[in-house]
């Protein structure tokens, strides 16, 4: 039974069934309406500032106590890491990623790409992330680096891409490229979409059936196999000596840096191309190189890595060599290679692994000798295996570290001790033959060379007591006969570094650690490089021609097969994307370039009669928001095309000859003069335009001449001009509508009555750019620095254009719609389609970045969203298009590969969401919601509290730092300003109220108040 609402003065009382009275927390005092109530003042508003920059006084000891008690930095003493193999650094959140991606400059000829071993198009994938196009980003990454997920986790970017980043010298430093890469591929992984071979690679010659052997299933081998599989080779076999693939990523690098699930997913992606992996097959044990040749394998890739530990005996002193031989008998001595393999087998469960072994049991003080990545992996693992103290001792100084920053800094944060300039002399043993200490000599710089890299022992002897020792002096090739035939030195194989081909055998190629490759990403590139030259070797052997310039196929899935063709005004298009009549279509060469990129149509820059020819002022294009912000919104006072009408006619003939299947749309403007419109139509009659757009909406410059917007704000004029034009031509006519007229549907109706087949919604909105505080424009015209109201475009225009698209689609369904206005991302594009548009005109996005990158993002995003929307499994798991559910990485949802159901065509989704846009009076009032704050996600910043207190209903209580704000449901009206102002995605969500809700009127309204608004909404019951 609903609670009864009683009115007593201005207070609202709830009387429940048990007669217990509840008073509203924020009830008004009729005698002090301009003051907060006592409870609001004392419990809510007490934390709100009223004076700023007022000096304060606080004892230093109080500050010190606070800083110690609430330290949120990543430092620790290592002890809490015991037994925990969780990721060191949590996966970057989507919100963090979008902010970081926005910080990227998207440099042309990007230095980061040149610094990337696999030459990933970093600019493009970061732009895709900026637009939340996860598939586009992942496709871009995986096209060049098939192991993009584990490389994102392990890439030493401080030595590669980030080292060359153009913002590396700034306060925030280089872009976190590896973190962005990992997130994009991880989200794609959760989509569960299979890699397939590009279906265009069919009817290949029999040479593509040549047997190919790949030895080892590590990063270089998996990369090589992937590209061979993508090229179309059907008979690729990997022979792996252990029971799972992935190489050191799966078997040695610790779980906290490289989770096994990600590495095995990458192995599975290789198998999806038809590559066969044979486990527990070792070269030298189960087969020989001669065996492979005799079995018909035409080419072999060797990616076995360095399988044996460097004992440290060769080249060392006699004392150290003898002590190493003795140490190998001690149970507390470990080679790093064996140590990490044992840890990996015990901790990283998965794949075809059958027998699990115990991890090494450590305690006390562990000393690690060496300072490479492997040594630090051992040191950090030691903490997790029970060590109370870990020391890394190394021969040189910190400036000569072999380890990269990405692993050294986390090791330092974990409390590992570092002893530099320590050259090991020998191990010391106790009576039981166990190592009890390591004896060192100070190995100091000699200062007699320019680089200060020469060191010498100084006979300053010291010992470091220990309970365990891990010796990490690197690894070497196995001492086997086949290795000796390929060696160029005592440690590495001899190859042509341009092709990865061995000098001993023309049919053999090698990559990875065995040839001295320094890191995981370089190993992937070795395999990638070898794949092309293996392909070249095989094809030329079979008499086939191979291009001199490598042409490697990229990453491909079912998403790339999604049909995004459309039809508008009876004209078919392969995709809905085209360039608007704007600066990007200033000339025909620019339009031709857009066609080469993939845009399916272009609207030429607006042409006028010669008598109306214009001359532009300079400068005339500017940023509408603060120029310091990289927001995709522009303003302009550019007029119509300065080129002659004849240029646009003659050029149309030439471009349609070269691009007969592309759609070319003319754009015309004239005054409200029938003869002018008849003349201009007759002058373009020989131009092979597929459609003609009438520009009745240019908001500046032409308006003063009685053209553009001057003709487009009166439905009668729109109808007249349209009818004059349609009476002279059979070409479909489009009317470009102004956003300045309140009811776009009335203008669209008039255009349709005049014979138009479509409307473009919309042109730009006139506005002024912010000047400097002294009133001078940022980029004014002439000596006077004058400015004029100009057309505002991009993101700032989109809300208005989208609303007009909805209105026209609902009220004038008989007319087709070209959407135009802030279409920056694929998300925007699909929203316009859902709201009734059939084709999408692009401008600001291309002004902000190159047309090719923009098209790639738009196309892949639209395809991915359409695919994901049709995938019922993804929808069931909470995906919104390709946008993953909140905290997807913790949901443990299966990533089993599953095809989408039939993906609808674009014309099937046009207008599909119009019913979601409703007048307010028709919206449900039966569910009143209140915010719910997630304690796990809340940063305790108080932003929601501030917004609610000064711009809401004083319904959030906040007791200061280190406290999660508390929602006062009795006073909450469900406005959701807290959600809008929260800086953390999904930290606050709206849920149905648990209490009844009655609107607080302050003073009860008179009897004129509609009774339907004097209601109490009960709690919603699901």
Q: Where in this protein do the model-derived segments appear?
A:
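Alpha/beta catalytic cores of nucleotide-metabolism and tRNA/nucleoside-modifying enzymes
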Residues: 36-40, 48-49, 74-89, 537-562, ...
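Beta1-alpha1 glycine-rich phosphate/pyrophosphate-binding loop at the start
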Residues: 63-90, 119-130, 140-142, 169, ...
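Iron-sulfur cluster-binding cysteine motifs and their immediate structural context
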Residues: 106-131, 150-184, 275, 832, ...
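FAD-site-proximal beta/loop scaffold in flavoenzymes
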Residues: 325-363, 448-522
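Alpha/beta enzyme core
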Residues: 593-596, 671-818, 826-842, 919
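C-terminal helical cap(s) of enzyme catalytic domains, especially alpha/beta-barrels
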Residues: 614-629, 770-789, 833-834, 845-871
